[in-house]
């Protein structure tokens, strides 16, 4: 088969374009961990954290190449000391990469940071870092706005409490064909149920919010003691770490109903008295402390602040990333903005968000231990 010169040139241009776009994409996400990197680091945790950690790796039913990791932390040196149980979950929605990074950093701090040892004296942890690995890999490969799993199901609408199938299947909050129809949801539910924790954290991004139940209704929590305990600590965290965060019920704060979600299941079905959903980043809101960090960094590196801000306003990273998104509810321009909305795209912002909310997470756990 012979190709014309025009065809050969076209193929060459397409090949170069794909290579350049992939290079730009990798550069844009260079400080985010990929799924293979996360898996490798988790596999090596026992050798770094002994005797504190054990790993349960479950092979996915969808492919033998992927595993779901369930990490347990405890301090066996104090076996008779009463401890609280804390369950932390991230990665349900693949495009929310910063949520996974926060929890991954928290795991490493439990292993290596002496300031975190007191948490292991008082708590047993069970942590799922990357709850939707196949979806996450698609995001890493350029499909930057994916919220669902490989079956186009939102696994945080697939829980068997107040589940509803009113959402059309082509929308990104598709709840699935039935409650717990998805392997990811079943995996999380089994781990959460068997652990029976005192506290549950589900970490996300997209807004700034520190939420307690409910997400499916605007009704208040009936148990006033539990409601007050959750509101008290969330308001403390808001004041110290996120002054513009919404605090309260997501349904009430956002005027938006989320059926079949893990937050309400954890609280109403499993009776976990401290059930939280944290939203830790949104591009739409300026974080005063973060802006100060950026200004300090600009001065430190002798960069013209006005030039930097002008470049950022032009979305210089995203405009150069041609992508193929599977979501049908976004326009092309919205797709290009999507990853930037859910995740910080510069290193200063990335480091600040992780450090800031990690401190908030530690303080929340300390509060729970004292009550």
Walk through the language-model features, giving the residues of each.
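Acidic, glycine-rich loop-and-strand cores that form catalytic or ligand-binding grooves
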Residues: 218-253
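Active-site-adjacent mobile loop/cap segments within catalytic or ligand-binding domains
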Residues: 200-202, 208-224, 260-371
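Classical eukaryotic N-terminal signal peptides for Sec-dependent ER targeting/secretion
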Residues: 1-12
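Soluble metallo-hydrolase cores and metallopeptidase-like ectodomains found primarily
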Residues: 30-84
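Active-site/substrate-binding loop(s) of hydrolase catalytic cores
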Residues: 80-92, 96-228, 279, 325-344
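N-terminal signal peptide
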Residues: 13-31
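Active site of divalent-metal-dependent phosphoester/diester hydrolases
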Residues: 144-145, 241-268
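Phosphate/oxyanion-binding active-site loops and adjacent basic polyanion-contact surfaces
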Residues: 34-38, 60-64, 96-100, 180-184, ...
């Amino acid at each position: 088969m012979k190709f014309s010169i025009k065809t050969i040139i076209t193929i060459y241009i397409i090949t170069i374009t794909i290579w350049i776009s992939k290079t730009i994409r990798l550069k844009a996400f260079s400080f985010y961990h990929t799924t293979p990197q996360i898996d490798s680091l988790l596999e090596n945790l026992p050798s770094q954290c002994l005797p504190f950690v054990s790993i349960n790796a479950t092979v996915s039913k969808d492919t033998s190449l992927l595993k779901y990791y369930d990490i347990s932390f405890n301090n066996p040196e104090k076996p008779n000391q009463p401890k609280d149980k804390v369950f932390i979950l991230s990665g349900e929605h693949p495009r929310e990469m910063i949520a996974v990074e926060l929890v991954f950093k928290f795991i490493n701090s439990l292993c290596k940071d002496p300031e975190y040892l007191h948490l292991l004296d008082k708590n047993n942890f069970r942590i799922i870092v990357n709850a939707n690995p196949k979806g996450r890999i698609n995001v890493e490969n350029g499909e930057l706005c994916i919220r669902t799993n490989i079956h186009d199901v939102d696994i945080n609408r697939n829980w068997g409490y107040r589940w509803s199938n009113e959402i059309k299947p082509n929308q990104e909050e598709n709840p699935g064909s039935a409650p717990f129809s998805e392997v990811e949801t079943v995996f999380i539910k089994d781990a959460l149920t068997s652990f029976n924790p005192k506290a549950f954290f589900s970490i996300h991004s997209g807004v700034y919010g520190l939420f307690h139940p409910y997400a499916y209704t605007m009704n208040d929590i009936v148990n006033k003691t539990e409601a007050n305990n959750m509101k008290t600590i969330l308001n403390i965290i808001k004041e110290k770490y996120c002054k513009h965060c919404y605090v309260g019920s997501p349904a009430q704060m956002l005027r938006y109903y989320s059926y079949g979600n893990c937050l309400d299941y954890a609280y109403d079905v499993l009776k976990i008295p401290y059930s939280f959903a944290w939203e830790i980043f949104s591009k739409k809101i300026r974080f005063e402390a973060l802006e100060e960090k950026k200004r300090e960094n600009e001065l430190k590196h002798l960069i013209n602040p006005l030039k930097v801000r002008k470049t950022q306003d032009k979305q210089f990273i995203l405009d150069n990333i041609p992508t193929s998104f599977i979501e049908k509810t976004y326009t092309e321009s919205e797709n290009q903005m999507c990853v930037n909305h859910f995740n910080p795209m510069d290193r200063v912002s990335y480091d600040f968000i992780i450090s800031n909310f990690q401190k908030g997470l530690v303080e929340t756990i300390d509060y729970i231990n004292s009550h």
